[in-house]
A protein has these predicted regions:
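Transmembrane helical elements of multi-pass membrane transporters/channels
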Residues: 19-38, 142, 176, 205-209, ...
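Hydrophobic/aromatic residues in alpha-helical transmembrane segments
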Residues: 22, 38, 77, 118-119, ...
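Helix-terminus/linker motif at the lipid-water interface of multi-pass membrane proteins
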Residues: 29, 33-54, 123-130, 186-193, ...
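N-terminal transmembrane alpha-helices
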Residues: 8-48, 61-76, 80, 105-112, ...
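Small-residue-rich hydrophobic transmembrane alpha-helices
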Residues: 53-113, 150-169, 263, 277-335, ...
């Protein structure tokens, strides 16, 4: 632990952040493979690829809710663990990790029961047609039964990164993704299981990742260990974790509501082909958002530790570096989406009608994504500094206050309602990024002057 303190508190800020960011970004990119490799293979199944891809895409709102509950714990607990470690309170840090593990197990039991029973009704609500519902159900029911592994991987892995073991955290995702990539073609095509094979491959790979995490957090190499005597939930531990994680939870759960809004509106105005295009666009957009989250995930321990230690200049340097990386990446990604949307769409499907539809709609949807890096960098920095309330408000701004209403309003104001649905995204991206960035810079110095509260 002393070595971790010395590195976080006195080493080169940029070097430290890169050491943590690179594995975190790699882990997020590899994690992206969990989400898109299935879709790439499914989209190329002969004869049913487009319908099967659309059906699996309709499972996205449930998938996002599962991820949201995992990150309610992981994104809330990891910064508090780092702050406690920076304050020299190892006992409290281990209580946070152990309580968080218990909460993830409880969430997984409840969510499995609720989503498995409600899947048929929910998928219809999301816009499933008679042609796409069988594929949506086949995939979702298997995935839901393995949701405990999903929650453990997503919820506990941040506790490895926040201790400075970024490479170990990266390996968690890499191992699972490699297994998924190997199993997908075997189960989907070799054994002829189709979408069921894709779901089985994902669940098995997540199970291996969960075992890897638990072995590390109970082993000798970790600084902070999972402890049986600390697993009984304590209100004074859990509530602060939930309070800080709620902003990420809102961001991810509103992604679910957002996905429902897009799918239902596009099903109404454009039919299955529009919903299928949205599935491809959503997958492509993760190529932007997940690496940014990896950058912020790598920057969080450095910011949180030095904030807890009262080293303001290092916190400022860490934020500037994080903002620069996020902003540059999203601008480059925007350029790619404007120049070659058809090539990106072709990765996910061989259906020419779906590729053509996706090409023009992707340009509209991605028109404001260059601003996303600034919004996420500032919003995640609020979290790293323990500012739960303002982080939550900013998480609500883009999706709840701006985007979801625009999805339903713009189709009535424009001659082409489908164009209006897709246009809602860039309008809200640019407005939200502007407001979030201004808010952060107006509060940043004041937060640093007040310092971190005792965890």
């Amino acid at each position: 632990m002393a070595q971790a303190k010395q590195d976080m508190g006195s080493g080169s800020v940029k070097k430290l952040m890169l050491q943590l960011m690179i594995p975190a970004v790699v882990a997020q990119v590899v994690n992206l493979l969990y989400n898109i490799v299935d879709r790439i293979y499914i989209g190329h199944i002969a004869g049913i690829g487009a319908a099967a891809l659309t059906g699996v895409g309709l499972f996205t709102p449930i998938l996002m809710l599962l991820n949201a509950f995992a990150m309610l714990v992981g994104a809330g607990g990891a910064p508090r663990t780092a702050i406690a470690l920076g304050q020299g309170d190892k006992e409290q840090a281990e209580k946070i990790i152990s309580n968080s593990f218990t909460m993830l197990l409880l969430f997984s039991v409840v969510l499995t029961v609720v989503f498995y029973a409600g899947a048929p009704t929910l998928l219809r609500l999301f816009g499933a047609s008679d042609a796409t519902l069988p594929y949506a159900l086949a995939y979702s029911r298997i995935y839901i039964l393995g949701s405990v592994f999903v929650l453990l991987v997503l919820g506990m892995n941040p506790f490895i990164t926040t201790q400075g073991f970024a490479k170990t955290s990266m390996l968690t995702t890499v191992i699972g993704a490699v297994i998924n990539i190997i199993l997908d073609p075997i189960l989907i095509f070799g054994l002829g299981l189709g979408v069921r094979g894709a779901a089985i491959a994902t669940v098995l790979s997540q199970a291996v990742g969960a075992v890897w995490i638990l072995r590390f957090l109970t082993g000798k190499k970790t600084i902070l260990r999972l402890r049986k005597d600390c697993m009984r939930p304590e209100k004074k531990v859990i509530l602060p974790v939930m309070a800080l994680g709620i902003s990420t939870f809102v961001m991810m759960s509103t992604e679910s509501l957002l996905s429902i809004s897009f799918s239902s509106s596009l099903a109404r105005y454009g039919g299955d082909v529009a919903v299928g295009a949205m599935t491809v666009i959503t997958s492509a957009s993760q190529l932007c958002t997940l690496p940014i989250q990896g950058i912020c995930q790598g920057g969080q321990p450095v910011m949180s530790f030095n904030f807890g230690a009262g080293k303001k200049s290092r916190v400022k340097e860490a934020f500037r570096f994080q903002l620069t990386l996020c902003g540059c990446y999203t601008c480059l990604f925007w350029l790619l989406m404007m120049l070659a949307p058809g090539a990106v769409a072709g990765i996910f499907t061989s259906d020419t009608a779906l590729i053509s539809y996706t090409t023009w709609s992707m340009r509209i949807y991605m028109a404001g994504i260059f601003a996303m890096g600034f919004q996420i960098a500032c919003q995640q920095s609020f979290m790293a500094l323990g500012q739960a309330k303002v982080s939550l408000l900013l998480a609500c701004l883009r999706k709840i206050i701006l985007l979801i209403p625009l999805i339903f309003i713009l189709p009535h104001l424009l001659p082409d309602p489908v164009f209006g649905v897709f246009l809602a995204e860039p309008v809200s991206d640019i407005l939200a990024a502007t407001i979030t960035t201004i808010t952060f810079f107006s509060r940043f110095n004041g937060i640093l002057e007040r310092g971190a509260a005792k965890v």
